[in-house]
Amino acid sequence: MADLWDDIYNDTKLLEELAPIAIDAALLQGVLMRTKESPNSSDVVSFAPFALLPSPVPKALFEQAKCVQEDFNTLVDRISQDTSFLEQVLSSTIKVDDFIRRLFAIHKQVQQEDCTQEVFLGINRSDYMFDCRDDGTPALKQIEINTIAASFGGLASRTPAVHQHVLKFLRKSEESSSILTNDAVEGIGWGIAHAWALYGSVDATVMFLVENEQRNILDQRFIEAELCKRNVRVIRRRLADVFERGTLDEERHLFIDGYEVAVAYFRTGYVPQDYTEQDWEARLMLERSRAVKCPDVPTQLVGTKKVQQELSRPQILEKFLPDKPEAVARIRETFTGLYSLDIGEEGDEAVRVALANPDQFVLKPQREGGGNNLYGEELKEKLQECKDSEERTSYILMDKINPKPLKNCLLRAGGRVQISECISELGMFGVYVRHRDQMIYYDQVGHLLRTKAIEHSDGGVAAGVAVLDNPYLV
């Protein structure tokens, strides 16, 4: 596995020749991002960073991640319907984390107002690394599950063609034909279209809720194109636009700029800096509305690290999946050690062990978007700072996953062509649609492989650390 492409990596002249061919293939396939200098204009775009060659991934672990995704779909949906569980689990976090507190307050307010919802749409992505066990064999271990704005389904659907072209250029036709197709964008588009259809108005629109700066717009445009094929109109608006021009009628139908909104698909709203006070008002309006929210607030809260940690406790999975013992076993097999930092003996012991062995753990806040986790000395400093205060309850502790590094060449605009020691993270996309109490559809719909140099502890493609990749199953 380690020497899959060594004949290429050892040929510096070939690498220099190959890199521009791969970059042009990415341009031809639309694997693109806007530039940092002009994040809201497509006049000038660049290729999204990607790996020169596909990274080897154990076939058994890929299939394991694929198989368990439907289980995670069911689990996320069921937890999102249990407000008392979310309130109990997040009670300590809400005291010290204003972002989580405000989200939960919106959920409680909408519940008290009895703003019933009939159609539910979930688009999530469960991320894993391949932990190297003591005997040298790899094991699939979950990093997190993203329940809001799970990105790169669009671009990931186009990267297989890039690596197929590169391998054909290298006269490796058999290897080229082994690159997996990736139907993430079709599955995501199908899920949104199905929710739109269940809303029941052919004149209604799908609204993408987007950030003020939209570098990754091309990833979203692929999903828009899928919806266009199905004759579903898409509009793009910011939360600020919803506040300024959004209205609810007496039956809670949401309108903006003359459009009735059937589905509100979030590609923003996952970190505190996404919100002004007016944006929070817009989020409340959206949550009150009859529009299908992807996600609604409780589903977003299911994706918090605190809920992830709580699910690792005995009997919690069984509480939500009492009819699915095999699913419980599949999910539990992906868990690594997760530890509460709540005030009390259990949290005190976790702090003590982490301070004594900081390189064995990751300190994780309740934040999405990459680049937020703390490792090593930074972990130690933060825990020393907050070990005796309630601030520590805004974090969880997780065993550090240790993948075996592999070689690759990471291509970035303006970057050098050089070989790096890398690790990869595998994401599986899941989509589900529920109508009242009936699950209409739930499936694993595609994958995402991101690879980064080992010197980077945290951060994804959008954060400028990882690059897009494809799994080459071995």
Swiss-Prot record:
Record's cofactor remark: Binds 1 Mg(2+) ion per subunit.
Superkingdom of the organism of origin: Eukaryota
GO molecular function, one term: magnesium ion binding
Binding-site list for ATP: 144, 305, 364-373, 375, 398-401, 425, 452, 458
Pathway: Sulfur metabolism; glutathione biosynthesis; glutathione from L-cysteine and L-glutamate: step 2/2
Tissue distribution of the protein: Expressed ubiquitously.
EC number: 6.3.2.3
Cofactor: Mg(2+)
A Pfam family hit: GSH_synth_ATP
Positions that bind substrate: 125, 148-151, 214-216, 220, 267-270, 450, 461-462
NCBIfam families with a match to the protein in the record: glut_syn_euk (TIGR01986)
Assembly and interaction partners: Homodimer.
Protein's name according to its UniProt entry: Glutathione synthetase
